[in-house]
Amino acid sequence: MHFAFLGTSGSIPTAVRDTTSIVVVVPDGALLIDCGGSPVQKLRRAGVDPQALVSVVITHIYPDHSYGLPALVRNLAVLGRQAPLTIYCRPEHVEPLRSLLSLFSTLERPGMFALTIRAIDLAEDVHAFDLGPLSVRTSPNEHSAMPNFAVRVDVARRRNVVYSSDTRPCDAVVALARGADTLVHDATYSERDRNRPAGHAHSTAAEAGEVAARAAVGGGPGVPATAAGRTAPARRTPHPRS
């Protein structure tokens, strides 16, 4: 298993970083988690064949995590894809995603590959689905008024990565990330923002490191700097609620 960052920015892309998304690759295929703009281009830049995608996870439906989905589906269809594709999301996001794809006439087209949008279980640390040797588990996290969830990908309990995008520090993510090799965690704010209003449901880079340390990411909590180094880069955005 290996994974690649397709984007690490907040809700506003920078000149060199797009919105948050990662791809996890195994011999059986690839799993895309969140879908920003130009996903096919970014997959190719990462050395991943877009046709290798088997599943897509959309953690929540703020635009920076989902707006690239119609482009992805349309591009795959134009490329001649025949294999089915499954999109996983929260139950309340199934219909909004169907509406988004329908708006661009990409939900169903004559001769198009089979596309399924499937709801995940909302319980903490629950098995969601498998992809070859990958076992995917999820837990709700805490992101203001927008329901969201974190994702853990394990390869036969040998190697793993945990991804939690927009969230404040929370126990559910600590539990999901327990003993993980790598934690990719929201790090929107700098330390000077630690006393931000409670409604700004993101984390500082230091808080992301504290979550990693509490979860003993990378082998133990004794070296917080190492744990912090396993989180996503700090990213500033003028729209902290997205």
Q: Which residues does each predicted region cover?
A:
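Cap/insert and terminal regions of metallo-dependent hydrolase folds
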Residues: 168-242
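Binuclear metal-dependent hydrolase catalytic cores
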Residues: 1-163, 168, 173-175, 234-242
